């Protein structure tokens, strides 16, 4: 019923509004074109065109079929290439999760541009997660590869890891915050008076990591690092921020860095992927990272030193 030739004939008639013009476009006779449409209407049991002596126009059913037919034809036309790609060991879909600390729209766009040029028939899905939410996606939600899992050891022996670097932290507040000009290390009693600005761990199955907050201290949860830094600049609260993301603001005296009794140690992050079952696209992404190629440099800018 919906063979490619019939679909092409239907689309041509719909686009030209004429059996004769469609026939001319398809290098067919008008009678052949008209008969193919008549047969299609008989097989579907609905009228697809309103006919006048000078032109034809789509019925509601015809309009619906037109919107679908173009997609079907595109799918049929691309299928041979898709099958060859699958036969060559290329995945049909690759799901990639990125740690919030490493996420950058420009970095994702750069990697996507590189991937799309090489794997035009693979569907790529990117997700942005926080702390243990990155491992959660890899372990339980069908993700193929993670950029920035916490730690340098896998949570399961079915994964491979490549250390990317360690995030250095600074404890900051706005330049006009009451604690900004206190001399010497701040005490817990001083810190507890002001809210801690944090981003909540996005883990759904694994245990969430608890961000810095003193017992009895008010906590304000924000969705991402951009909002957290904006909240610090606005004087809303205090907390730890990755040093590369706040150093310029510190140098401009918009934020102040202070020492507290328990400073946050560096956070090591790694690339992680499944040992088994991966395809060529994942293999190529891993190579980009292990070889520190420029296509993935945007993901690594948060590290003070990037391994060469």
Curated annotation (Swiss-Prot):
Point out the DNA-binding stretch(es).
19-38
Ranges for domain HTH lysR-type: 2-59
Is DNA-binding one of the keywords UniProt gives this record? yes
Q: Which UniProt keywords apply?
A: Activator, DNA-binding, Transcription, Transcription regulation
Q: Tell me which PROSITE patterns the record gives.
A: HTH_LYSR
State if Ion transport is listed as a keyword.
Answer: no
Do you know which SUPFAM superfamilies this protein is assigned to?
Periplasmic binding protein-like II, Winged helix' DNA-binding domain
- Recorded GO MF terms: DNA binding; DNA-binding transcription factor activity
Describe the function of this protein.
Positive regulator essential for the expression of allD operon. Binds to the allD promoter.
User: Which family does the UniProt entry place this protein in?
Assistant: Belongs to the LysR transcriptional regulatory family.
Q: What is this protein called?
A: HTH-type transcriptional activator AllS
| Lineage per the UniProt record | Bacteria, Pseudomonadati, Pseudomonadota, Gammaproteobacteria, Enterobacterales
């Amino acid at each position: 019923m919906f063979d490619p030739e019939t679909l092409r004939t239907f689309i041509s008639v719909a686009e030209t509004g004429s059996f004769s013009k469609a026939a001319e476009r398809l290098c067919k006779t008008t009678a052949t074109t008209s008969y193919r449409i008549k047969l299609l209407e008989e097989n579907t049991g609905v009228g697809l065109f309103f006919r006048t002596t000078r032109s034809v126009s789509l019925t509601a059913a015809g309009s619906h079929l037109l919107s679908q037919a173009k997609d079907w034809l595109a799918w049929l036309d691309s299928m041979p290439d898709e099958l060859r790609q699958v036969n060559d060991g290329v995945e049909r879909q690759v799901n990639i999760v990125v740690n919030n600390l490493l996420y950058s729209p420009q970095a994702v766009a750069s990697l996507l541009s590189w991937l799309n040029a090489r794997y035009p028939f693979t569907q790529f899905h990117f997700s942005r997660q926080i702390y243990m939410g990155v491992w959660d996606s890899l372990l339980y939600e069908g993700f193929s590869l993670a950029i920035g899992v916490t730690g340098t050891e896998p949570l399961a022996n079915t994964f491979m890891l490549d250390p990317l670097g360690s995030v250095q932290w600074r404890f900051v507040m706005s330049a006009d915050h009451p604690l900004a000009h206190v001399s010497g290390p701040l005490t817990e009693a001083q810190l507890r008076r002001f809210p801690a600005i944090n981003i909540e761990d996005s883990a759904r199955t694994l245990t969430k990591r608890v961000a810095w907050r003193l017992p009895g201290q008010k906590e304000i949860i924000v969705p991402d690092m951009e909002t957290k830094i904006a909240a610090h600049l606005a004087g809303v609260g205090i907390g730890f921020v990755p040093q590369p993301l706040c150093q310029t603001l510190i140098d401009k005296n918009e934020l102040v860095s202070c020492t507290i009794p328990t400073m946050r140690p560096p956070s090591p992050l790694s690339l992680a992927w499944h040992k088994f079952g991966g395809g060529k696209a994942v293999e190529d992404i891993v190579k980009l990272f292990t070889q520190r190629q420029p296509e993935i440099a945007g993901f690594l800018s948060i590290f003070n030193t990037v391994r060469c």
